[in-house]
Amino acid sequence: MPKPKPSPRNRGNAIALLVIDFQIGLFEKPTPVYHAAEILVNANNLIQRAHLAGISVVYIQHCNDSFLQKDTPDWQLHQELLPPAENDLRIYKRHGSAFRDTYLEQELEARHVGDLLICGLVTHGCVRAACLDACQMGYRVTLAADAHSSFSKDAPRLIEEWNTRLAQAGVQVLPAGEINFTTEVALA
């Protein structure tokens, strides 16, 4: 039985799209990102639709002291991902969750965001952490089922497992093409 979600803590009705860790270094691991081309197409579709709908887009990039050092080639956003537009946010993180030790929550609050759409890498790491933390913080969360992935050899199983587990935790899991960019996202 899923845990009851906390009340929304006066979250607004605005929507934001979180684009998590689409970084070159993650696409160039020895085990390739599962369905990389499809994931990039679906993420770009979400970004385009968000921009057309006037929805905040937040690009999140992981920084560490090894292969994702800030400002190195591997740290950069994937060249096939649509680049951030002038009004898009960029958040740099050092932990799995985009909320931990960043100003993401403050930025979302300033924009009266209550609904989060999430896509990114990696399914069982940073995507999982962002979804669960956002639910715990009272956001209404929708994960694009076909716009997150992993470079694990077990990626198909992990994606299916985490789509199920996150849905049980209160995350709405939908194919990217079925996500409705309105304030009724959580009811789609």
Sequence positions of predicted segments:
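Glycine-/proline-rich flexible loop or hinge segments
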Residues: 30, 61-64
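Short acidic, Gly/Ser-rich segments with clustered Asp/Glu that frequently serve as metal-coordination loops
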Residues: 24-29
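Active-site-adjacent betaalpha module
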Residues: 2-16, 42-48, 53, 65-188
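Short beta-strand segments at enzyme active-site cores
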Residues: 20, 56-62, 144
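Short glycine-enriched, charge-decorated loop/helix-capping segments at active-site entrances
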Residues: 31-37, 67-68
